[in-house]
């Protein structure tokens, strides 16, 4: 079957903006790589989400370096950073803040919660009660907090990096599917390779690697990179390819609930940044493929049969990508 051809003559040439983007993005990834060694793919995915301005969900087993990765990212960018350790008894007011009566001045005052920072690390988000989870997830969507009828804006840029252990662990509350959709990407760190593990053990004097990195970018740099990313050319054939992938999630026999348009929009925004981070002014199909699992796997729900058969959402998306026809690059 003949596949649509992408007209490369329409593509934007790499300008000084794209060169600047490539250099700054690489600097950020290299800096975080000092904290989480040998994990370039998840670091690039997280950095992409930060530039887009989306939220990140890191899901992996205990001790794989989720919090280290999150703190490494936060410490690499000169922006306000707060960490919330989620526990079953944490209240929504502990996250967003409270209004209290100031007896000295005789008036009500608002005391900001830890969510008022540019980068918020929500550690072990699935250990908190659904009510507290909802409080954070509302801020993620609305970018503002309403307490006692008064609305307070959070700082910009505003990015939540949440970590969670897989559901098999005891004492956890599963994030609802609708709220999972609020995260731009979901990725995992995985255990380090053999040689990296040996090298880590050799460095006996470093207790906390995230503390050793210093900022290489400012908050304004992130906003500037976001502006460049929005000008990256994306061909209609690539847009159709993205829509075909998302539509395929709705017709797959193993998937009970497919991805919404939010997934297609997220994939488009991420692909632009991924292309620019590669030093290109245009998106190619591989950009979409590299990101599809991280962007879409948490937006779908498998059928009971597929789950019982041991399939994972990541495997399902990967296998599905092989069946969707890829547009070829024309000369």
Q: Where does each model-flagged region fall?
A:
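Conserved AAA+/SF3 P-loop NTPase catalytic/coupling segment centered on the Walker-B
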Residues: 114-141, 155, 170-180, 191-199
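Walker A/P-loop
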Residues: 47-87
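C-terminal engagement/docking regions of AAA+ P-loop ATPases
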Residues: 2-15, 19, 251-331
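Conserved AAA+ ATPase core "coupling" helix
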Residues: 92-96, 172-244
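Conserved alpha-helical scaffold flanking the Walker A/P-loop in AAA+ ATPase domains
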Residues: 44-48, 101-121
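AAA+/P-loop NTPase substrate/partner-engagement loops
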Residues: 76-104
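Pre-Walker A (pre-P-loop) alpha-helix and adjacent loop at the N terminus of AAA/AAA+ ATPase modules
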Residues: 18-64, 243
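AAA+/SF3 P-loop NTPase mechanochemical coupling elements
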Residues: 109-118, 147-164, 175-185, 262
